[in-house]
Amino acid sequence: MGTQEGWCLLLCLALSGAAETKPHPAERQWRAADVVLDCFLAKDGGHRAALASSEDRARASLVLKQVPVLDDGSLEDFTDFQGGTLAQDDPPIIFEASVDLVQIPQAEALLHADCSGKEVTCEISRYFLQMKGTTVETEAWFMANVQVSGGGPSISMVMKTPRDAKNEALWHPTLNLPLSPQGTVRTAVEFQVMTQTQSLSFLLGSSASLDCGFSMTPGLDLISVEWRLQHKGRGQLVYSWTTGQGQAVRKGATLEPEQLGMARNASLTLPSLTIQDEGTYICQITTSLYRAQQIIQLNIQASPKVRLSLANEALLPTLICNIAGYYPLDVVVTWTREELGGSPAQVSGASFSSLRQSVAGTYSISSSLTAEPGSAGATYTCQVMHISLEEPLGASTQVVPPERRTALGVIFASSLFLLALLFLGLQRRQAPTRVGLLQAERWKTTSCADTQSSHLHEDRTACVSQPS
């Protein structure tokens, strides 16, 4: 068993032993601990780029020295890294990195990853500065990219070897760098960029926050922040911030400038998500000396709507299940049939329509099935499974045999006939009353007209009898 495997085993035993006596969260205290990671060192292929790597890799270890972590009691018997790999035939290259001048917010996730059943991938490569005055023999820079599986964090760190390392007696034969008495390459983390989540899923129309933070040593200046989107071979700028000026290329994209200086937070907010927002986002932070980035995958989802209808009422009726407004494309449609007193059974023979895509980018499809009602009828269910649904979504309808449909039709027609007769009867009952009221109204109108005519005749007579 190697040193790294033994160290992880001891840590897991310590964590399991302290599980039953885990204190209240309020009682947790900060403690400095060494975080040891199994890595690979990408051999220098002569590429002068920010991240130089090749297919050839060598075994390596990364020891983050005395990282502050919250201790819940499980680190009581924890032992820091002691080295001791020089006696091996093929010892890994050990990088000791101090974190005195930067913050590692997700150190706990790195420390407990093995015991939590998560995998940590770590790759170290040379980092080349585009500047003069650096001495390769005594100064070197490395980039360490660390990722935790299962939705864990991802962190990229720029590490620098100290200038006084030239006084060391031991030298690494391939790196041509001085080694400590323990046989390690001593470095210091001067800049790091991290994200808490490497992949996110949001519903269509909602808002998304893409996490991106950084930490740097005093003396470095923040130059720019850039968010870019890569999707289906195309790249585009989403948001940029340079020396105090922010510009949103994607409508509504926001980044809080005050958070850059105070909290070292470069997170991006995207409101009213559309299908076009899906893809790989790159958060790139540039300082006066270093540049690093994080990659975040944003997935857009839209839940389907399911509607089941009866297309015809033939001897063997056809059922149509409409699935509309879903994204992404993959969807599973199953049909089940259940007779009275029986259990649901999956049926085959369904056909599908051509795929349809809306202007918004969502998909729709229809599934048709010829139903067999049987002698007592049956209930058919169209069930849809999609990544946006926590559980399958279904719609059901009951299909009855032809004789029952005929009987039901007769009952329905008879009911309509009886209702019509009842309505006519009520109309006839109300007819005499309405006729009487109408005649009374006519008599009243005639009487008033006769009275007015009489008065008019008297007035005319009076006018004629007056002397001139």
Curated annotation (Swiss-Prot):
Residues 19-405 are lumenal. Residues 304-394 form the Ig-like C1-type domain. Component of the antigen processing and presentation pathway, which binds to MHC class I coupled with beta2-microglobulin/B2M. Association between TAPBPR and MHC class I occurs in the absence of a functional peptide-loading complex (PLC). Expression seems to slow down and down-regulate MHC class I surface expression. Gene3D superfamilies: Immunoglobulins. Residues 1-18 form the signal peptide. It comes from the Eukaryota. The chain crosses the membrane at residues 406-426. It is found in: Cell membrane; Endoplasmic reticulum membrane; Microsome membrane; Golgi apparatus membrane. PROSITE patterns: IG_LIKE (PS50835), IG_MHC (PS00290). This is Tapasin-related protein. Residues 181-297 form the Ig-like V-type domain. It comes from Pongo abelii (Sumatran orangutan). Residues 427-468 are cytoplasmic. The keyword Repressor does not apply. Glycans are attached at N265.
